[in-house]
């Protein structure tokens, strides 16, 4: 694709996944860098790497390093949908209360009889952690930890015992592995022990040949048993020294340099299919990866990453604070005209999308692909009343158009599960999406009515389909997604009702997300946001039908 140079701050109408960090970029070479002079002490200080399937938060502690690990399909629960069949009977009653101005009573009735009863969707969950312990390195100097946005790698460097050590961390776009490359400026100095742990249930940790293996099953949630089977597998190659796996610990001794390779696989194949073989997939993936030396895999990863990241350059001026750590620049941003920090924040958003939304993978959740909790905030799901959309605001405008593919796959999936929900809850044709979905593509109205009684998520999703066509002019793509746009419109057309107080057609009940009105409720009729979304969708469907 054509390289684009953006010279205006107006290009910063973008959003990033919810990972805290920002930092100092540059103009040429390896210059877009987030850097720090101390290890991470908490999860939000660790640095994110990812290839859309595997994510890691890298702490960079010299004596006891930690990589918190995620695999995109490790979610609680199992295939299901959560539409409430009671809704079809009670929605007309809720609507009548709205017409009477009894908004609080309408909202309470909807919470009791319209919202999902089985579950509110499943949480995204962690695989666990890789710990790498380096004996004798508790004392160190000259510490530096950085995330290079130009090469999509984290680097940790420090001096201990008179030896300079360096670690490179990559979640490879060219192979489904995370690599940790260990070097020193003196031969025979790489000695460490690596092991994996997990907060998940029924976990088994073992050694197989020169590999360590951790397998388990995802967690229960809201009475739904977890059925995602997963296997994590790691090994190491060295120049000099030895590698031994014993009792679930990978032992590297006296190496000149070493590379740890790690992969994770699950039995997930599709939202309604968990028949995959995680054991076989993980074994084959790891064995294929170690056939190539680190330098070769690193170059392949770099080439693929740069083919996407390198399309856009934003130049806001000279970097005046390159010698300052990123956390200092963030802390003092309000005191300085640090335009370069703004530039890097823009590129950091693009980096995060590249790390979380490659074609053929799941879309980024509320936290991208990075999560260390079994029950994260808002379950780290796909929240469709702005958050999922926000993740993709940079995609077209920042020249990452093909990274919309995971979102479009999700839309296709929820158009299937949402068809069942439309019939069950509303007695309507077409498909419906409320304000959240998950790996299993549930489409029922979840949580309580004040936040979840919102049936126009499909209209907002469809805007991204139309936007992609406008940016690409791809008529074949438009033809392939037209049924999803049309059927989202069909549902809304069939569920619109005439307000007896003014004879206008509108959606009722609904709400304006996170925006209560003076009647001590959010439940309402004909909210402005719905009107705008419906107008856009109907207009786009009509125009698409003529192309």
Task: Enumerate the predicted regions with their spans.
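Membrane-interfacial loop-to-helix junctions in multi-pass inner-membrane proteins
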Residues: 477-481
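Catalytic cores of eukaryotic secretory-pathway lumenal/extracellular enzymes that build
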Residues: 499-500, 514
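Aromatic-residue-lined binding/catalytic grooves and analogous aromatic/hydrophobic interfacial grooves
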Residues: 24-450, 456, 465-469, 474, ...
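C-terminal, helix-dominated tail/subdomain
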Residues: 508-544
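Bacterial Sec-dependent N-terminal signal peptides
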Residues: 1-25
């Amino acid at each position: 694709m054509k390289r684009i140079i953006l010279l205006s701050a107006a290009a910063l109408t973008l959003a990033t996944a919810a990972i805290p960090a920002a930092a100092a970029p540059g103009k040429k070479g390896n210059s877009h860098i987030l850097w720090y002079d101390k290890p991470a002490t908490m999860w939000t200080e660790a640095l994110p790497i990812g290839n859309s399937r595997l994510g890691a938060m890298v702490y960079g502690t010299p004596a006891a390093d930690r990589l918190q690990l995620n695999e995109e399909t490790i979610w609680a629960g199992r295939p299901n949908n959560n539409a409430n069949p009671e809704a079809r009977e009670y929605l007309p009653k809720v609507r009548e209360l709205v017409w009477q101005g009894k908004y609080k009573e309408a909202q309470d009735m909807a919470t009791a009889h319209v919202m999902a009863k089985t579950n509110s969707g499943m949480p995204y969950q962690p695989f666990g952690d890789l710990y790498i312990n380096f004996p004798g390195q508790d004392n160190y100097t000259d510490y530096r930890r950085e995330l290079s946005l130009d090469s999509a790698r984290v680097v940790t460097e420090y001096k201990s015992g008179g030896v300079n050590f360096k670690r490179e961390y990559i979640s490879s776009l060219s192979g489904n592995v995370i690599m940790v490359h260990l070097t020193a400026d003196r031969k025979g100095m790489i000695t460490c022990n690596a092991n994996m742990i997990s907060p998940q249930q029924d976990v088994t940790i073992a050694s197989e040949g020169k590999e360590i293996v951790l397998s388990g099953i995802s967690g229960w949630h809201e009475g739904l048993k977890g059925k995602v089977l997963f296997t994590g597998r790691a090994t190491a190659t060295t120049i000099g020294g030895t590698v031994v796996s014993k009792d679930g610990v990978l032992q590297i001794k006296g190496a000149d340099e070493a590379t740890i390779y790690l992969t994770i696989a699950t039995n997930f194949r599709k939202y309604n299919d968990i028949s995959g073989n995680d054991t076989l997939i993980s074994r084959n993936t790891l064995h294929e990866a170690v056939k190539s030396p680190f330098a070769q895999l690193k170059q392949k990863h770099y080439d693929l990453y740069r083919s996407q990241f390198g399309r856009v350059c934003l130049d806001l001026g000279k970097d005046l604070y390159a010698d300052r750590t990123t956390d200092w620049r963030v802390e003092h941003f309000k005191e300085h005209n640090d335009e370069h920090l703004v530039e890097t924040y823009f590129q950091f958003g693009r980096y995060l999308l590249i790390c979380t939304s490659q074609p053929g993978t799941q879309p980024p959740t509320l936290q991208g692909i990075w999560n260390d909790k079994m029950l994260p905030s808002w379950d780290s799901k796909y929240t469709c009343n702005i958050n999922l959309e926000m993740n993709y605001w940079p995609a077209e405008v920042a020249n990452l158009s093909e990274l919309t593919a995971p979102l479009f796959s999700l839309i296709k999936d929820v158009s299937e599960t949402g068809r069942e929900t439309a019939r069950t809850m509303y007695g309507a044709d077409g498909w419906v999406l409320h304000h959240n979905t998950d790996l299993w593509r549930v489409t029922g109205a979840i949580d309580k009515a004040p936040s979840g009684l919102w049936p126009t998520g499909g209209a907002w999703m469809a805007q991204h389909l139309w936007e992609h066509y406008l940016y690409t002019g791809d008529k074949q793509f438009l033809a392939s997604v037209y049924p999803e746009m049309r059927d989202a419109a069909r549902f809304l057309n069939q569920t619109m009702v005439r307000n007896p107080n003014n004879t206008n057609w509108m959606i009722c009940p609904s709400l304006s997300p996170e925006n209560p009105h003076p009647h001590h409720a959010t439940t309402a009729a004909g909210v402005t946001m719905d009107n705008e979304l419906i107008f856009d969708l109907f207009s786009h469907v009509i125009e698409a039908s003529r192309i």
